[in-house]
Amino acid sequence: MTLSSQHYLVITALGADRPGIVNTITRHVSSCGCNIEDSRLAMLGEEFTFIMLLSGSWNAITLIESTLPLKGAELDLLIVMKRTTARPRPPMPASVWVQVDVADSPHLIERFTALFDAHHMNIAELVSRTQPAENERAAQLHIQITAHSPASADAANIEQAFKALCTELNAQGSINVVNYSQHDEQDGVK
């Protein structure tokens, strides 16, 4: 199937976790003739969320759009769907990965996302988990962020700002910046 004849749909399914639920959803997607291009699954409390980017012919996408709400009701799932298009990813010459461990309190995740925003970086992935307080230890927040920068300079400048924010918040943090143009030159690719 040519790219122009492909159609795309983003689906989010949210509901109580139980054995076999993800298989039931993916089997329904396949039975409609759709392909799962990309997906993410997360457990949040007793709920799960399953996000998928589907591709297929116009007929396949229309079939999943018309049948998934019924399947969702049958499985007691909240289903959200939105048509989208394929687009080439713009070049991102630098990527940044950070991990942070800090005593939990409100606004911490916002502080780190604001840091990336101030450096014009696109957050591609954000994972956070809170460990409950135990004995004498306060609740701990663990944050992982992956971000991409359209400008190498923004990625280089974020290192010092990240370290300063970790110091201000009394957080333990690590940052890894990869500048792909430098990385390629080291590997002999220009």
UniProtKB/Swiss-Prot annotation:
One record GO biological process: DNA-templated transcription
Function: Negative transcriptional regulator of the glycine cleavage system operon (GCV). Does not autoregulate its own expression. It is not yet known how GcvR acts as a repressor. It does not seem to bind DNA. It could interact with GcvA and suppress its activatory activity.
InterPro entries: ACT-like_dom_sf, ACT_dom, GcvR, UPF0237/GcvR_regulator
Gene3D superfamilies xrefs: 3.30.70.260
Residue ranges of domain ACT in the record: 10-91, 97-176
Gene Ontology, cellular component aspect: cytosol
Disulfide topology: none
Membrane-spanning segments: none
Domain of life from the UniProt record: Bacteria
PANTHER family noted in UniProt: GLYCINE CLEAVAGE SYSTEM TRANSCRIPTIONAL REPRESSOR, UPF0237 PROTEIN MJ1558
SUPFAM superfamilies: ACT-like
Protein name (database record): Glycine cleavage system transcriptional repressor
Subcellular location: Cytoplasm
CDD domains recorded: ACT_GcvR_1
Keywords in alphabetical order: Cytoplasm, Repeat, Repressor, Transcription, Transcription regulation
